[in-house]
From Swiss-Prot:
GO molecular function: tryptophan synthase activity
Cofactor names: pyridoxal 5'-phosphate
Name the record gives this protein: Tryptophan synthase beta chain
Xref: SUPFAM superfamilies: Tryptophan synthase beta subunit-like PLP-dependent enzymes
Gene3D superfamilies to which the protein is assigned, alphabetical: 3.40.50.1100
Modified residues annotated as N6-(pyridoxal phosphate)lysine in this record: 90
EC number: 4.2.1.20
Organism: Bacillus pumilus (strain SAFR-032)
Segments forming a coiled coil: none
Protein backbone atom coordinates (compact mmCIF):
# COMPACT_ATOMS: atom_id res chain seq x y z
CA UNK A 1 0.00 0.00 0.00
CA UNK A 2 1.47 3.36 -1.06
CA UNK A 3 1.89 5.68 1.95
CA UNK A 4 4.14 8.69 1.39
CA UNK A 5 5.47 11.10 2.53
CA UNK A 6 6.66 10.05 5.98
CA UNK A 7 6.45 12.35 9.02
CA UNK A 8 9.65 14.12 7.92
CA UNK A 9 8.20 14.95 4.51
CA UNK A 10 10.36 12.36 2.76
CA UNK A 11 9.49 10.20 -0.22
CA UNK A 12 12.15 7.56 0.27
CA UNK A 13 15.34 9.63 0.29
CA UNK A 14 13.74 12.56 -1.56
CA UNK A 15 11.90 15.64 -0.32
CA UNK A 16 12.47 17.17 3.12
CA UNK A 17 13.03 20.81 4.12
CA UNK A 18 16.23 22.52 2.97
CA UNK A 19 15.36 26.13 3.74
CA UNK A 20 16.68 29.11 5.75
CA UNK A 21 15.97 28.99 9.48
CA UNK A 22 13.54 31.90 9.07
CA UNK A 23 11.19 29.67 7.04
CA UNK A 24 11.15 26.65 9.36
CA UNK A 25 8.46 28.10 11.64
CA UNK A 26 6.16 29.31 8.80
CA UNK A 27 6.44 25.86 7.18
CA UNK A 28 5.63 24.20 10.50
CA UNK A 29 2.56 26.42 10.90
CA UNK A 30 1.36 25.60 7.37
CA UNK A 31 1.90 21.87 7.97
CA UNK A 32 -0.01 21.99 11.26
CA UNK A 33 -2.92 23.94 9.75
CA UNK A 34 -3.10 21.63 6.73
CA UNK A 35 -3.04 18.46 8.84
CA UNK A 36 -5.87 19.81 11.01
CA UNK A 37 -8.03 21.11 8.17
CA UNK A 38 -7.74 18.05 5.92
CA UNK A 39 -9.46 16.06 8.70
CA UNK A 40 -12.18 18.72 9.14
CA UNK A 41 -15.44 17.73 7.35
CA UNK A 42 -16.54 21.39 7.15
CA UNK A 43 -13.31 22.36 5.34
CA UNK A 44 -13.66 19.44 2.95
CA UNK A 45 -17.27 20.34 2.21
CA UNK A 46 -16.39 23.98 1.55
CA UNK A 47 -13.56 22.92 -0.78
CA UNK A 48 -15.67 20.40 -2.68
CA UNK A 49 -18.47 22.95 -3.04
CA UNK A 50 -16.05 25.44 -4.61
CA UNK A 51 -14.72 22.80 -6.99
CA UNK A 52 -18.25 21.92 -8.08
CA UNK A 53 -19.98 25.31 -8.14
CA UNK A 54 -17.08 27.63 -9.00
CA UNK A 55 -14.62 25.55 -11.03
CA UNK A 56 -17.06 23.16 -12.70
CA UNK A 57 -15.94 19.76 -11.46
CA UNK A 58 -16.10 16.93 -12.15
CA UNK A 59 -14.38 17.44 -15.49
CA UNK A 60 -15.34 15.20 -18.40
CA UNK A 61 -13.67 11.99 -19.51
CA UNK A 62 -13.74 12.15 -23.31
CA UNK A 63 -13.27 9.19 -25.63
CA UNK A 64 -11.27 10.48 -28.61
CA UNK A 65 -12.99 8.22 -31.14
CA UNK A 66 -11.89 9.98 -34.35
CA UNK A 67 -8.30 10.14 -33.15
CA UNK A 68 -8.27 6.53 -31.95
CA UNK A 69 -9.62 5.34 -35.31
CA UNK A 70 -7.04 7.43 -37.18
CA UNK A 71 -4.11 6.05 -35.16
CA UNK A 72 -5.44 2.51 -35.45
CA UNK A 73 -4.29 1.33 -32.04
CA UNK A 74 -5.51 1.66 -28.46
CA UNK A 75 -8.63 3.53 -27.39
CA UNK A 76 -7.56 6.98 -26.19
CA UNK A 77 -9.44 8.73 -23.41
CA UNK A 78 -8.77 12.31 -22.31
CA UNK A 79 -9.27 13.56 -18.75
CA UNK A 80 -10.43 17.08 -19.55
CA UNK A 81 -8.71 19.39 -17.06
CA UNK A 82 -8.84 22.01 -19.84
CA UNK A 83 -12.55 22.40 -19.01
CA UNK A 84 -11.84 23.78 -15.52
CA UNK A 85 -12.49 27.43 -14.73
CA UNK A 86 -9.32 29.33 -15.84
CA UNK A 87 -8.50 26.55 -18.33
CA UNK A 88 -6.22 24.13 -16.51
CA UNK A 89 -5.76 21.87 -13.49
CA UNK A 90 -4.05 24.67 -11.54
CA UNK A 91 -7.35 25.99 -10.11
CA UNK A 92 -7.82 22.75 -8.10
CA UNK A 93 -4.76 23.50 -5.98
CA UNK A 94 -5.26 27.28 -5.92
CA UNK A 95 -8.74 26.96 -4.41
CA UNK A 96 -7.48 24.56 -1.74
CA UNK A 97 -4.50 26.70 -0.77
CA UNK A 98 -6.59 29.90 -0.77
CA UNK A 99 -8.97 28.29 1.71
CA UNK A 100 -5.97 27.19 3.79
CA UNK A 101 -4.51 30.72 3.71
CA UNK A 102 -7.81 32.26 4.76
CA UNK A 103 -8.22 29.82 7.65
CA UNK A 104 -4.68 30.76 8.76
CA UNK A 105 -5.61 34.45 8.76
CA UNK A 106 -3.30 35.42 5.88
CA UNK A 107 -4.53 38.31 3.73
CA UNK A 108 -1.87 38.24 1.00
CA UNK A 109 -0.99 35.58 -1.58
CA UNK A 110 2.43 35.14 -3.20
CA UNK A 111 2.71 32.90 -6.27
CA UNK A 112 5.22 31.94 -8.94
CA UNK A 113 4.19 31.03 -12.46
CA UNK A 114 5.69 29.74 -15.71
CA UNK A 115 3.00 29.35 -18.35
CA UNK A 116 0.87 31.77 -16.38
CA UNK A 117 -1.86 29.24 -15.59
CA UNK A 118 -0.99 29.01 -11.88
CA UNK A 119 -0.62 32.79 -11.77
CA UNK A 120 -4.07 33.20 -13.30
CA UNK A 121 -5.50 30.61 -10.90
CA UNK A 122 -3.88 32.35 -7.90
CA UNK A 123 -5.13 35.77 -9.03
CA UNK A 124 -8.59 34.30 -9.62
CA UNK A 125 -8.95 32.77 -6.17
CA UNK A 126 -7.44 35.88 -4.57
CA UNK A 127 -10.20 37.93 -6.23
CA UNK A 128 -12.80 35.38 -5.12
CA UNK A 129 -11.61 35.44 -1.49
CA UNK A 130 -10.77 39.15 -1.26
CA UNK A 131 -7.01 38.61 -0.88
CA UNK A 132 -4.17 40.61 -2.41
CA UNK A 133 -1.99 38.71 -4.89
CA UNK A 134 1.62 39.17 -6.01
CA UNK A 135 2.80 36.95 -8.87
CA UNK A 136 6.46 36.44 -9.80
CA UNK A 137 7.02 35.51 -13.44
CA UNK A 138 10.22 35.19 -15.47
CA UNK A 139 10.73 37.95 -18.03
CA UNK A 140 10.96 35.39 -20.84
CA UNK A 141 7.64 33.88 -19.78
CA UNK A 142 6.04 37.33 -19.46
CA UNK A 143 6.78 37.83 -23.15
CA UNK A 144 5.71 34.32 -24.18
CA UNK A 145 2.49 34.46 -22.18
CA UNK A 146 1.41 38.11 -22.52
CA UNK A 147 -2.29 37.18 -22.57
CA UNK A 148 -2.07 35.45 -19.20
CA UNK A 149 -0.13 38.43 -17.79
CA UNK A 150 -2.99 40.70 -18.87
CA UNK A 151 -5.53 38.31 -17.31
CA UNK A 152 -3.66 38.38 -13.99
CA UNK A 153 -3.57 42.17 -13.95
CA UNK A 154 -7.25 42.32 -14.90
CA UNK A 155 -7.95 40.11 -11.88
CA UNK A 156 -6.17 42.63 -9.65
CA UNK A 157 -2.83 40.89 -9.18
CA UNK A 158 0.55 42.59 -9.25
CA UNK A 159 2.83 40.81 -11.73
CA UNK A 160 6.56 41.18 -11.08
CA UNK A 161 8.81 40.26 -14.06
CA UNK A 162 11.99 38.45 -12.97
CA UNK A 163 15.09 39.25 -15.03
CA UNK A 164 17.67 37.05 -13.28
CA UNK A 165 18.92 33.81 -14.86
CA UNK A 166 17.00 32.78 -17.95
CA UNK A 167 13.96 34.72 -16.83
CA UNK A 168 11.86 31.55 -16.52
CA UNK A 169 10.06 29.48 -13.85
CA UNK A 170 13.14 28.62 -11.76
CA UNK A 171 14.04 32.29 -11.44
CA UNK A 172 10.47 33.29 -10.63
CA UNK A 173 10.41 30.67 -7.86
CA UNK A 174 13.72 31.94 -6.44
CA UNK A 175 12.35 35.49 -6.22
CA UNK A 176 9.01 34.37 -4.77
CA UNK A 177 10.82 32.49 -1.97
CA UNK A 178 13.06 35.49 -1.25
CA UNK A 179 10.00 37.73 -1.01
CA UNK A 180 8.23 35.24 1.27
CA UNK A 181 11.22 35.13 3.65
CA UNK A 182 10.77 38.89 4.16
CA UNK A 183 6.95 38.87 4.43
CA UNK A 184 6.00 35.51 5.94
CA UNK A 185 4.07 36.98 8.89
CA UNK A 186 1.07 38.07 6.80
CA UNK A 187 1.75 36.49 3.38
CA UNK A 188 0.93 32.95 2.27
CA UNK A 189 3.13 31.40 -0.43
CA UNK A 190 0.89 29.48 -2.83
CA UNK A 191 3.24 27.05 -4.63
CA UNK A 192 1.78 25.89 -7.93
CA UNK A 193 3.29 22.42 -8.28
CA UNK A 194 4.40 19.41 -6.21
CA UNK A 195 7.78 21.03 -5.59
CA UNK A 196 9.43 22.97 -2.78
CA UNK A 197 9.98 22.09 0.88
CA UNK A 198 7.64 19.88 2.91
CA UNK A 199 4.66 20.18 3.34
CA UNK A 200 4.08 21.77 -0.10
CA UNK A 201 4.50 18.65 -2.29
CA UNK A 202 2.02 16.84 -0.04
CA UNK A 203 -0.44 19.77 0.01
CA UNK A 204 -0.46 20.21 -3.76
CA UNK A 205 -0.74 16.45 -4.30
CA UNK A 206 -3.75 16.32 -1.99
CA UNK A 207 -5.45 19.24 -3.77
CA UNK A 208 -4.89 17.61 -7.19
CA UNK A 209 -5.79 14.02 -6.38
CA UNK A 210 -9.39 14.42 -7.57
CA UNK A 211 -8.09 14.31 -11.16
CA UNK A 212 -7.25 10.61 -10.88
CA UNK A 213 -10.06 9.81 -8.44
CA UNK A 214 -12.64 11.15 -10.90
CA UNK A 215 -10.96 9.59 -13.94
CA UNK A 216 -10.83 6.16 -12.32
CA UNK A 217 -14.51 6.25 -11.40
CA UNK A 218 -15.47 7.57 -14.85
CA UNK A 219 -13.37 4.93 -16.61
CA UNK A 220 -14.94 2.09 -14.62
CA UNK A 221 -18.38 3.48 -15.45
CA UNK A 222 -17.65 3.85 -19.19
CA UNK A 223 -15.48 0.77 -19.81
CA UNK A 224 -15.97 -1.44 -16.76
CA UNK A 225 -12.19 -1.74 -16.37
CA UNK A 226 -9.05 0.26 -15.71
CA UNK A 227 -6.86 1.72 -18.48
CA UNK A 228 -3.68 -0.10 -19.47
CA UNK A 229 -1.61 3.09 -19.49
CA UNK A 230 -2.01 6.47 -17.76
CA UNK A 231 0.06 9.26 -19.30
CA UNK A 232 0.68 12.85 -18.14
CA UNK A 233 3.17 15.62 -18.87
CA UNK A 234 5.70 16.47 -16.16
CA UNK A 235 7.31 19.81 -15.36
CA UNK A 236 7.13 20.17 -11.59
CA UNK A 237 4.56 17.44 -11.92
CA UNK A 238 1.26 18.33 -10.21
CA UNK A 239 -1.17 17.21 -12.92
CA UNK A 240 0.72 13.92 -13.19
CA UNK A 241 0.73 13.24 -9.44
CA UNK A 242 -2.95 14.18 -9.33
CA UNK A 243 -3.63 11.61 -12.04
CA UNK A 244 -1.33 8.87 -10.70
CA UNK A 245 -2.53 8.91 -7.07
CA UNK A 246 -5.64 6.83 -7.81
CA UNK A 247 -3.70 4.18 -9.77
CA UNK A 248 -0.50 3.67 -7.75
CA UNK A 249 -1.71 0.41 -6.18
CA UNK A 250 -3.23 -0.92 -9.43
CA UNK A 251 -1.65 -2.91 -12.26
CA UNK A 252 -1.61 0.08 -14.59
CA UNK A 253 1.43 1.44 -16.46
CA UNK A 254 2.10 5.01 -15.32
CA UNK A 255 4.08 7.21 -17.70
CA UNK A 256 5.41 10.75 -17.23
CA UNK A 257 6.48 12.81 -20.23
CA UNK A 258 9.16 15.47 -19.79
CA UNK A 259 10.12 18.20 -22.25
CA UNK A 260 12.95 17.10 -24.55
CA UNK A 261 13.06 20.53 -26.20
CA UNK A 262 15.41 20.43 -29.18
CA UNK A 263 16.53 16.94 -28.13
CA UNK A 264 17.91 15.34 -24.97
CA UNK A 265 21.33 15.06 -26.61
CA UNK A 266 21.46 18.85 -26.93
CA UNK A 267 21.72 21.38 -24.07
CA UNK A 268 18.23 22.63 -24.97
CA UNK A 269 15.84 20.45 -22.96
CA UNK A 270 14.05 20.22 -19.61
CA UNK A 271 14.24 16.43 -19.17
CA UNK A 272 15.09 16.40 -15.46
CA UNK A 273 14.70 12.70 -14.72
CA UNK A 274 16.04 11.56 -18.10
CA UNK A 275 19.22 13.65 -17.84
CA UNK A 276 19.37 14.95 -14.26
CA UNK A 277 21.16 13.95 -11.06
CA UNK A 278 20.31 14.20 -7.36
CA UNK A 279 20.51 17.60 -5.71
CA UNK A 280 18.62 20.23 -3.76
CA UNK A 281 16.45 22.85 -5.44
CA UNK A 282 13.90 25.18 -3.85
CA UNK A 283 14.10 23.44 -0.48
CA UNK A 284 13.75 19.83 -1.64
CA UNK A 285 16.08 16.92 -2.44
CA UNK A 286 15.17 15.62 -5.88
CA UNK A 287 16.61 15.24 -9.37
CA UNK A 288 17.73 18.36 -11.19
CA UNK A 289 19.62 19.45 -14.27
CA UNK A 290 23.05 20.55 -13.01
CA UNK A 291 26.68 20.60 -14.08
CA UNK A 292 29.58 18.78 -12.41
CA UNK A 293 29.96 21.70 -9.98
CA UNK A 294 26.34 21.52 -8.83
CA UNK A 295 25.30 24.65 -10.72
CA UNK A 296 21.82 24.63 -12.25
CA UNK A 297 21.80 24.29 -16.03
CA UNK A 298 19.08 26.49 -17.49
CA UNK A 299 16.31 24.31 -18.92
CA UNK A 300 14.63 24.89 -22.26
CA UNK A 301 11.23 24.01 -23.70
CA UNK A 302 8.81 25.61 -26.13
CA UNK A 303 6.37 25.09 -23.27
CA UNK A 304 6.62 27.73 -20.53
CA UNK A 305 5.06 25.33 -18.03
CA UNK A 306 7.62 22.55 -18.45
CA UNK A 307 10.97 24.38 -18.43
CA UNK A 308 11.73 23.73 -14.76
CA UNK A 309 15.19 22.30 -13.90
CA UNK A 310 13.92 20.17 -11.01
CA UNK A 311 10.99 17.84 -10.43
CA UNK A 312 8.68 17.11 -7.51
CA UNK A 313 10.29 14.80 -4.91
CA UNK A 314 7.42 12.32 -5.18
CA UNK A 315 8.22 11.93 -8.89
CA UNK A 316 11.89 11.40 -7.99
CA UNK A 317 10.83 8.58 -5.67
CA UNK A 318 8.41 7.06 -8.18
CA UNK A 319 11.24 7.02 -10.74
CA UNK A 320 13.80 5.55 -8.34
CA UNK A 321 11.34 2.86 -7.23
CA UNK A 322 10.47 2.01 -10.83
CA UNK A 323 6.73 2.54 -10.35
CA UNK A 324 6.52 5.26 -13.01
CA UNK A 325 8.32 5.29 -16.36
CA UNK A 326 9.60 8.72 -17.40
CA UNK A 327 10.15 9.49 -21.08
CA UNK A 328 10.42 12.73 -23.06
CA UNK A 329 8.95 14.44 -26.12
CA UNK A 330 10.58 17.13 -28.25
CA UNK A 331 9.10 20.50 -29.16
CA UNK A 332 8.33 19.19 -32.63
CA UNK A 333 6.67 16.02 -31.38
CA UNK A 334 4.47 18.09 -29.06
CA UNK A 335 3.52 20.53 -31.83
CA UNK A 336 2.64 17.66 -34.17
CA UNK A 337 0.48 16.04 -31.47
CA UNK A 338 -1.22 19.35 -30.73
CA UNK A 339 -2.14 19.81 -34.38
CA UNK A 340 -3.38 16.24 -34.72
CA UNK A 341 -5.70 16.40 -31.69
CA UNK A 342 -7.03 19.79 -32.82
CA UNK A 343 -7.75 18.54 -36.34
CA UNK A 344 -9.25 15.17 -35.34
CA UNK A 345 -11.22 16.09 -32.21
CA UNK A 346 -11.69 19.86 -32.26
CA UNK A 347 -9.83 20.17 -28.95
CA UNK A 348 -6.91 22.62 -28.71
CA UNK A 349 -4.61 21.39 -25.92
CA UNK A 350 -1.95 23.36 -24.07
CA UNK A 351 1.57 22.78 -25.41
CA UNK A 352 2.38 21.21 -22.02
CA UNK A 353 -0.40 18.63 -22.42
CA UNK A 354 0.67 18.00 -26.02
CA UNK A 355 3.90 16.41 -24.72
CA UNK A 356 1.81 13.71 -23.04
CA UNK A 357 -0.32 13.35 -26.16
CA UNK A 358 2.78 12.85 -28.34
CA UNK A 359 3.87 9.80 -26.35
CA UNK A 360 0.31 8.51 -26.07
CA UNK A 361 -0.03 8.59 -29.87
CA UNK A 362 3.34 6.88 -30.31
CA UNK A 363 2.49 4.12 -27.82
CA UNK A 364 -1.04 3.70 -29.13
CA UNK A 365 0.23 2.53 -32.51
CA UNK A 366 1.94 -0.46 -30.85
CA UNK A 367 -1.17 -1.47 -28.87
CA UNK A 368 -4.30 -3.41 -29.77
CA UNK A 369 -7.76 -1.90 -30.25
CA UNK A 370 -9.08 -3.41 -27.02
CA UNK A 371 -6.42 -1.69 -24.91
CA UNK A 372 -6.96 1.72 -23.29
CA UNK A 373 -4.72 4.76 -22.81
CA UNK A 374 -5.83 7.50 -20.41
CA UNK A 375 -4.18 10.90 -20.97
CA UNK A 376 -4.36 13.87 -18.63
CA UNK A 377 -5.23 16.86 -20.81
CA UNK A 378 -3.89 19.28 -18.21
CA UNK A 379 -4.95 22.53 -19.89
CA UNK A 380 -6.30 24.24 -22.96
CA UNK A 381 -4.17 25.86 -25.64
CA UNK A 382 -5.74 29.32 -25.88
CA UNK A 383 -2.75 30.76 -24.02
CA UNK A 384 -0.41 29.29 -26.64
CA UNK A 385 -2.11 30.56 -29.80
CA UNK A 386 0.38 33.41 -30.27
CA UNK A 387 3.35 31.03 -29.90
CA UNK A 388 1.72 28.50 -32.21
CA UNK A 389 0.97 31.15 -34.81
CA UNK A 390 4.60 32.29 -34.87
CA UNK A 391 6.09 28.78 -34.95
CA UNK A 392 3.69 27.14 -37.37
CA UNK A 393 3.53 30.08 -39.78
CA UNK A 394 7.32 30.26 -39.89
CA UNK A 395 7.32 26.57 -40.83
CA UNK A 396 4.49 27.04 -43.33
CA UNK A 397 2.33 24.48 -41.54
CA UNK A 398 -0.92 26.39 -41.15
CA UNK A 399 -3.53 25.84 -43.79
Amino acid sequence: MYAYPNELGRYGEFGGKFVPETLMQPLKEIEQAFNELKEDPAFEQEYLSLLHNYSGRPTALTYADQLSAYLGGAKIYLKREDLNHTGAHKINNALGQALLAKKMGKSNIIAETGAGQHGVAAATVAAKFGLSCTVFMGKEDVERQSLNVFRMKLLGAEVIPVTSGNGTLKDATNEAIRYWVQHCSDHFYMIGSVVGPHPYPQIVSEFQRMIGDEAKEQMLKKEGRLPHKVIACVGGGSNAIGMYRAFLDDEVDLIGVEAAGKGIDTPLHAATITKGTKGVIHGSLTYLIQDEFGQIIEPYSISAGLDYPGIGPEHAYLHASGRVQYVSATDQEALDALKLLTEKEGILPAIESAHALAKAFEMSRTMSEDEIILVCLSGRGDKDVHTLMNVLESEGKTK
